[in-house]
Structure formats: structure tokens, C-alpha cells
């Protein structure tokens, strides 16, 4: 009864500390990714095509005419940005709209959706911003891939 917790070696405390840190890390990443497995993760965004098109999110929408820059990247001001890429839309009024993807959408699939349904209806500045993200060789390669093996 007088004996408390005993360790076999000096490294046991390191193992215990490492295990606790790993559990905390696992819980944090689980709670960040959990929405992807709920009804919230079923539809990430919806596109209404055409000149008056919109990108619909859960509770808001962004008109194509308001888009200044559109890209898939890491949100730099959040812990979630370390683990997951988001779709980031910079609007002409300076506001930023972030669409969480939980890494469900791959970059080529997102590029194809933008090229087919969004890019033709964006303003000239937004089109130039989209095209300037890639070298000419990269863009030709993925456009050829979309023509040969469409996923959408």
C-alpha cells in the first residue's frame, strides 16, 4: 500500500510524456477532421454556372463577379492550416472566404472544376490571377489530362 507508481528505467517518464503528447495530437487532429465525416462534409461547395454564377457554401455565397483570386492552399492563421488545405477565395472588396475541404478534394479535381465551370465566367483579373499560379507547361499538362481523362 505504501508503494506508489514505480518505473523500470529513467526513460519511462519520457515514454509517458511522449504518449501524452501523442494522445493530445491525435485528439486535436480528430476534432479538426471530424466534420468531414458528418453531413457537413458531404457537399463542400456548389457551383451555379453562367455569367451570373455563384459558388454556394453552407450559409453564404460568392458571386463570380466578386472573385479576385481563387486558389487551394493552407490557411496561414489557424492551427487547422497546418494539416488541411482549404479553398481560399479573395473577393474584390478585400474579404477572404475560406472553404474547408479537410483534404477530401484533391488539387487536380479542384483545378478541373475551376477550369470547366468557374474560370470562363470570372472577370479578367481573376482569370489572370488563376492562370498565373501555374507555369505554361503545368497548365497545358493538366488541361490535356482533363481532356483525356475527365473526372467531372
Curated annotation (Swiss-Prot):
Annotated localization: Membrane
Lineage summary: Bacteria, Bacillati, Bacillota, Bacilli, Bacillales
Membrane association type: Single-pass membrane protein
Main location as per UniProt: membrane
Gene: yfjE
Iron-sulfur keyword on record: no
The entry's keywords: Membrane, Transmembrane, Transmembrane helix
Transmembrane regions: 12-34
Organism: Bacillus subtilis (strain 168)
Organism domain of life: Bacteria
Any one GO cellular component localisation term in the record: membrane
Name of the protein this chain belongs to: Uncharacterized protein YfjE
Regions annotated as coiled coil: none
InterPro entries: DUF5381
Family: To B.subtilis YfjD.
